[in-house]
From Swiss-Prot:
The keyword Lyase applies. GO terms for biological process: 3,4-dihydroxybenzoate biosynthetic process; amino acid biosynthetic process; aromatic amino acid family biosynthetic process; chorismate biosynthetic process. PROSITE patterns: DEHYDROQUINASE_I. It comes from the Bacteria. The lineage of its organism: Bacteria, Bacillati, Bacillota, Bacilli, Bacillales. 3-dehydroquinate binds at E46, W47, R48, R82, R212, S231, Q235. Homodimer. This is 3-dehydroquinate dehydratase. The active site is at H143, K170. Signal peptide: none annotated. Its EC number is 4.2.1.10. Belongs to the type-I 3-dehydroquinase family.
């Protein structure tokens, strides 16, 4: 499997990397969050820009990113606009979604960009090309907040993401039962054994919490923890998360 190196973080080796989302609505709130995250043991910061009140103003988005980067100069930043259809805060046109992501990928200030799988393939490929030209890694994602698809479907989506050029394919699904969590873990194990790229998977909510902890066992390269406000159901406090990941890593 290829390792994916972003600044001082290597995905695809050792314990899953910890990503903590920033969900501030204003520049002031984001700066406060960034200062707080500076004190926390994490690997990646995800800027969930769909929470930002001025997200439709690209000049203001870039200015906010400058402020975040000034506070976190060495921390890998994952830039994510989560669309409403995948559980995000805001519905925007496809045209704006791609303009936003392509513009920010070209700033030199982000390290990874989230690209949702279920869009026009030509648009997705263009965004991947723009990202890679600017040395930005692509987290290609899909989120199902209603259910856990069949194992074959989870495997198919992750495999498709890699085929399109994702550096880090990602899927998050909602369990209705413990069996659904096993389905996600089984799919993760199957894909990680044959994939060329590290993958990121999770089963959400309380039922799925084991999937956020057991990535090193089943093959998920990153997990999401909460420092203040969780951006998705089931995220664990980042300090507790590091403790458990370290505990499991020592057994390997």
């Amino acid at each position: 499997m290829n390792k994916v190196v972003v600044k001082n973080v290597t995905f695809g080796e050792g314990a899953p990397k910890i990503c903590v989302p920033m969900v501030g609505k204003t520049v002031a709130a984001l700066k406060e969050e960034a200062e707080m995250l500076k004190t926390i043991d994490l690997d990646v910061v995800e800027w969930r820009v769909d929470f930002f009140e001025d997200v439709k103003d690209l000049v203001k988005v870039k200015a906010a990113l400058d402020e975040i980067r000034a506070i976190l100069p060495e921390t890998p930043i994952l830039f994510t606009f989560r669309s409403a259809k995948e559980g995000g805060e805001l519905a925007v046109s496809d045209e704006f979604y791609f303009e936003l992501n392509e513009t920010l990928a070209g700033t030199g200030k982000i390290d990874l960009v989230d690209v949702e799988l279920f869009n026009e393939e030509a648009d997705v490929l263009r965004l991947i090309e723009t990202a890679h030209k600017n040395n930005v890694k692509v987290v290609m994602s899909n989120h199902d907040f209603d259910k856990t698809p069949a194992k074959e479907e989870i495997v198919s989506r992750l495999t498709r993401m890699e085929a399109l050029g994702a550096d880090l394919p990602k899927i998050a699904v909602m369990p209705k039962s413990a069996g659904d969590v096993l389905t996600l873990l089984d799919a993760t194990n199957t894909v990680s054994e044959k994939a060329n790229q590290p993958i990121i998977t999770m089963s959400m909510a309380g039922t799925g919490v084991i999937s956020r902890l057991a990535g090193e066992v089943f093959g998920s390269a990153m997990t999401f923890g909460a420092a203040k406000k969780a951006s998705a159901p089931g995220q664990i406090d980042v300090n507790e998360l590091r403790h458990v990941l370290d505990l499991l890593h020592k057994q390997f």
